[in-house]
Curated annotation (Swiss-Prot):
Species, as recorded: Nocardioides sp. (strain ATCC BAA-499 / JS614)
Region Disordered: start-end pairs: 1-25
Protein name: DNA ligase
Keywords, sorted A to Z: DNA damage, DNA repair, DNA replication, Ligase, Magnesium, Manganese, Metal-binding, NAD, Zinc
Residues annotated as the enzyme's active site: 172
Binding site for NAD(+): 91-95, 140-141, 170, 193, 233, 350, 374
Length: 752
C-alpha cells in the first residue's frame, strides 16, 4: 500500500505499475511509434503527429520529437504512480517505452541528457560531490523536549505580538536534509544540507529517487515558477532498510546501523545505480529561494509542491490553538512506528502565515517561527559485557561499553559511548569478568541517533560485582595517561608525536570531509601506509609518489606478463591524483586537518577569514588571535600551544614544500573600501542574500560580524531587522539601508 507518496520497492512489477491500463502501441513499418493511450493525456503534441484517443498511434519521423514525447510519457507515468497513486500504464507498456527511448539514445547519443528517464536507472553518471552554495541558507530548528517547552515557545510568539496564529504541524522525518533547485521547472541541482550555507552536489543520485520529478508540472492555480529551492528529507523506509541489511549480511558486508545512516550512505554512492537500488524516498517540507511564486502560508506552499508533482506528506495539519498542537503531538507519538513507513523522531510546528514568519525572523541558527518537538528517546535494558577504551587523534582516551546486541529505536546496538572516565564513575556502570555477567544497563539512543548508557539497573546487579578500574596507560602505546589541566574530566595520552593510535587517527582525519576530503585515504589506507613505514606521520602524506606506494601492498597489484614486480594499482593511482587535487583546498580546511584542539570548521573559517594565510596566523600573538571574530581565548591558546611543538611546525612546512596552498587568494581588483571596519547586516535585503552580503564585506577587507557591539562600525538594516537595529540605535552605531550599504561597498565611509 502506498503512503505519503512512497511505494515499496517490492510492489507489483519492475516499476510497481499494475497491469490494468488500456493503453497500447502498434508497430509502424514506415516510422517510429508514438504512445497515445492512457497515461499520455498530458503530453502536448501537434495534431499532425499524434492521433488523439486511447490505444492509437502515429508515426513521427523526427527522432528528437519522438524522444521528447516518450520521455514526457515516462515522466507522466512515474508522476501518476508515485505521487497521484493513479497509474495508467502497465509494466509491459512502461518497459516498451523505456526500451524505445534507450534505442533512440543509442542511435542519437546527443539525446542522452542528464535528465533523460534512461539516466535514472541506466548507466552510471559521474558523481564527484562538488560543493555548491545554497541560494538561501538552510537553517536548523530549535528543539523542545517537553510540552512545556513548546508552550514557552508559543508564549514568546505572543510576547512578540503574534496573537492566535494558525500553526502548521508535521512529522519530523529522521532522514537526510536535501535541497532541490528547479529552474523553469527543470531539476538542475540537488544539494545536501552541509553547513547550511554550502552543500554537496548529489544531483545524479537524487535523480534516481523515483518520487523526485526531473521536471515540475504546473496547474492553472500553481504555474511552474521561474526558480524554486525545494527543501525536504530523503529517507529509507524501515522495511527497505531491513531488506538492505539482510542482503549486506548475506554478502558478508557490515550492515548499516539505522535507516538514516543507510539513507545518507545510499545517497553518497559514487555509482548512481547503487543509489537507485536502495528504494529511497523523499518528503518535501518547505521552500527556500523562489522567483515567480510567493506563498501566503506554509500550507499554501505545500499545496503548490504537491501540484508541481513533488512528494509531500498527508500527515500535515493546520490547527488554531496550542491545544491542537499538543493533540497532534500526542496522536502522532502514539502511532510513531506505524503512522508512516519511515522513521520519525518528533513533530515540527510552524507559524503558517508567511508574513508573520518574515516578521519574526531568525536567530543566528534557527527561525523563531518554528520549533521541533523531539519525542523522548527510547530506552531499553541491555547486558553490559565489558568496557573498552580507545585513543583519538588529539590523545583523548574514551571509554565505551560493549553490550550484547540490543534493539533500540529501530537499530541493533552493541557499542555505546561512556564519554570519559568521570562519567563511568558517576554512572557507576560495572562490567563483568571473563565468563561472569556484568550490569544490566539502561540504554538510550539520545536524539534517536547516538546510543548512550544512562546507568545501571541496580536491582539486577550481580552480587559482588566490582567497580570498573580505568586504565592508567594508553591502550595504544602504553604511555601513562595525564590530565590536560587540573580537574579535566578527560584523560589523554601525551605521546602525541609517536603514539600509533593517534597517528592512525590523524592520518585518517587528514582525508576526512571537513579537512582535505581525499578519497582513497580511508582508515585502512592510513594503517597500511603507517605499517609499511611509507609515512612517519601526516606531514608525509603529500610527499607520496608511485615509488612510495609500491612499498604498501594495499596499493599494488600483481604484474602482468610483460611487467616486472608489483605494480601500482588503480586505487593507488587514484590516491595520487586525489592528493594532487587536495593541495588547492581553502586555508580553513588546512587548519582543520592539523588536528589542533578546538579548531573545527567554524574556528578554521574564522581564522582564515581574519588572517588570510598560515604565515599570518603563525605570526599572530595570542591576543590577536583571540580578538578575531569567532575565535576567542580558548581557541587562541590552543593554536599558540600547538605551534610551540617543532614537529607540528614541521608538518606545516612539509605540506607547504609539497605544494599545499597556505593562503587564500583574494581578488586584488576589488577595492579594499572596508579595511579595518566591522559591519553587521540584519534583516532581508533585496539584492543580497545573507551569504552574498557577508562575502561582499569580507572581499573588501571588512569584518562581517554577527552581533552589534561598541566595536561595530556600521549596521545595515533590511526588512524585518529585529533587535539588532534597536541595539545599534542604543549604542549610537551608524545605521544604513541597502542603498547606503552599496555606497559603502563602492566608496567606503568617505562616500557616505
Amino acid at each position: 500500500m502506498k503512503r505519503n507518496g512512497f511505494v515499496p520497492s517490492n510492489s507489483v512489477g519492475r516499476r510497481g505499475i499494475p497491469s490494468n491500463s488500456t493503453s497500447s502501441a502498434i508497430a509502424s513499418a514506415g516510422g517510429a511509434v508514438v504512445w497515445t493511450g492512457a497515461g499520455a493525456g498530458r503530453v502536448r503534441a501537434r495534431p499532425e503527429q499524434v492521433s488523439v484517443g486511447p490505444g492509437t498511434m502515429s508515426c513521427v519521423t523526427d527522432p528528437r520529437e519522438e524522444h521528447r514525447l516518450i520521455a514526457e510519457e515516462i515522466e507522466e507515468a512515474r508522476w501518476r504512480y508515485y505521487v497521484l497513486d493513479s497509474p495508467t500504464i502497465d509494466d509491459a507498456d512502461f518497459d516498451r517505452r523505456m526500451r524505445r527511448l534507450e534505442a533512440l539514445e543509442e542511435e542519437f547519443p546527443e539525446l542522452r541528457t542528464p535528465d533523460s528517464p534512461t539516466q535514472t536507472v541506466g548507466g552510471a553518471v559521474s558523481t564527484d560531490f562538488t560543493s555548491h552554495p545554497h541560494l538561501r541558507r538552510m537553517e536548523s530548528l530549535d528543539n523542545a523536549f517537553s510540552v512545556e517547552e513548546v508552550e514557552a515557545w508559543y508564549a514568546r510568539l505572543r510576547r512578540d505580538g503574534v496573537e492566535d496564529p494558525a500553526l502548521l504541524c508535521e512529522l519530523k522525518v529522521d532522514g537526510l536534509a536535501i535541497n532541490l533547485l528547479y529552474e523553469e521547472g527543470r531539476l538542475v541541482r540537488a544539494l545536501t544540507r552541509g553547513d547550511g550555507t554550502t552543500g554537496e552536489d548529489v544531483t545524479s543520485n537524487v535523480k534516481t529517487i523515483t518520487s523526485v520529478p526531473h521536471r515540475l508540472t504546473g496547474t492553472d492555480e500553481f504555474p511552474v515558477p521561474a526558480l524554486v529551492e525545494v527543501r525536504g528529507e530523503v529517507f529509507l523506509p524501515v522495511e527497505a532498510f531491513e531488506r538492505l541489511n539482510e542482503s549486506l549480511l548475506e554478502a558478508g558486508k557490515a550492515p548499516f546501523a539505522n535507516p538514516r545512516n543507510s539513507a545518507a550512505g545510499s545517497l553518497r554512492q559514487k555509482d548512481p545505480r547503487i543509489t537507485a537500488s536502495r528504494a529511497l524516498g523523499m518528503v518535501c517540507h518547505g521552500i527556500g529561494e523562489r522567483r515567480g511564486f510567493e506563498p501566503q502560508a506554509q500550507s499554501h506552499a505545500y499545496d503548490a509542491l504537491a501540484a508541481w508533482g513533488l512528494p509531500t506528506s498527508d500527515q500535515v495539519r493546520v490547527v488554531s490553538t496550542l491545544k491542537g498542537v499538543e493533540g497532534y503531538i500526542e496522536n502522532a507519538g502514539a502511532r510513531r512506528h506505524t503512522i508512516v513507513p519511515y522513521e520519525i523522531d518528533g513533530v515540527v510546528v510552524k507559524v503558517d502565515d508567511v508574513a508573520l514568519q518574515r516578521r519574526l525572523g531568525s536567530t543566528s541558527r534557527a527561525p523563531r517561527w518554528a520549533i521541533a518537538f523531539k519525542y523522548p528517546p527510547e530506552e531499553v535494558n541491555a547486558k553490559l559485557l565489558e568496557i573498552r577504551v580507545n585513543v583519538g587523534r588529539t590523545g583523548r582516551v574514551t571509554p565505551y561499553a560493549v553490550m550484547e546486541p540490543t534493539k533500540v529505536a529501530g537499530s541493533t546496538v552493541e557499542n555505546a559511548t561512556l564519554h570519559n572516565f568521570y562519567e563511568v564513575e558517576r554512572k557507576d556502570v560495572r562490567p563483568g569478568g571473563p565468563g561472569d555477567p556484568g550490569d544490566t544497563v539502561i540504554l538510550r539512543k539520545a536524539g534517536d541517533v547516538i546510543p548512550e548508557i544512562l546507568g545501571p539497573v541496580l536491582a539486577l546487579r550481580p552480587e559482588g560485582l566490582q567497580p570498573w578500574v580505568p586504565p592508567t596507560t594508553c591502550p595504544s602505546c602504553g604511555t601513562p595517561l595525564v590530565e590536560q589541566k587540573e580537574g579535566d574530566k578527560d584523560r589523554r595520552c601525551p605521546n602525541h608525536e609517536k603514539c600509533p593510535g593517534q597517528l592512525r587517527e590523524r592520518v585518517f582525519f587528514v582525508a576526512s570531509r571537513n579537512a582535505f576530503d581525499i578519497e582513497g585515504l580511508g582508515y585502512e589506507a592510513a594503517v597500511a601506509l603507517l605499517d609499511a613505514e611509507v609515512i612517519a606521520n601526516e606531514g608525509d602524506v603529500f610527499d607520496l609518489d608511485a615509488a612510495a606506494l609500491l612499498r604498501a601492498p594495499l596499493f599494488t597489484r600483481a604484474p602482468k606478463k610483460d611487467e616486472d614486480g608489483p605494480q601500482l594499482s588503480a586505487n593507488g593511482q587514484r590516491l595520487l591524483d586525489n592528493l594532487d587535487k587536495a593541495k588547492q583546498v581553502p586555508l580553513w580546511r588546512v587548519l582543520v586537518a592539523l588536528s589542533i584542539r578546538h579548531v573545527g570548521p567554524k574556528a578554521g573559517r574564522a581564522l582564515a577569514t581574519e588572517f588570510g594565510s598560515m604565515a599570518a596566523i603563525r605570526a599572530a600573538t595570542e591576543e590577536q588571535l583571540a580578538a578575531a571574530e569567532g575565535v576567542g581565548p580558548t581557541i587562541a591558546e590552543a593554536v599558540i600551544e600547538w605551534f610551540k611543538e617543532p614537529w607540528h611546525v614541521e608538518i606545516v612546512d612539509k605540506w607547504e614544500r609539497a605544494g599545499v596552498t597556505m593562503a587564500d587568494e583574494r581578488d586584488e581588483s576589488t577595492p579594499r573600501t572596508l579595511a579595518g571596519l566591522t559591519v553587521v547586516v540584519t534583516g532581508s535585503l533585496v539584492d543580497f542574500s545573507r551569504d552574498s552580503a557577508k562575502e561582499a564585506i569580507l572581499s573588501r577587507g571588512g569584518k562581517a560580524a554577527g552581533s552589534v557591539s561598541k566595536k561595530t562600525d556600521y549596521v545595515v538594516v533590511g526588512e524585518n531587522a529585529g533587535s539588532k537595529a534597536d541595539k545599534a540605535e542604543q549604542l549610537g552605531v551608524p545605521v544604513l539601508d541597502e542603498a547606503g550599504f552599496k555606497t559603502l561597498l563602492d566608496g567606503g565611509p568617505a562616500a557616505l
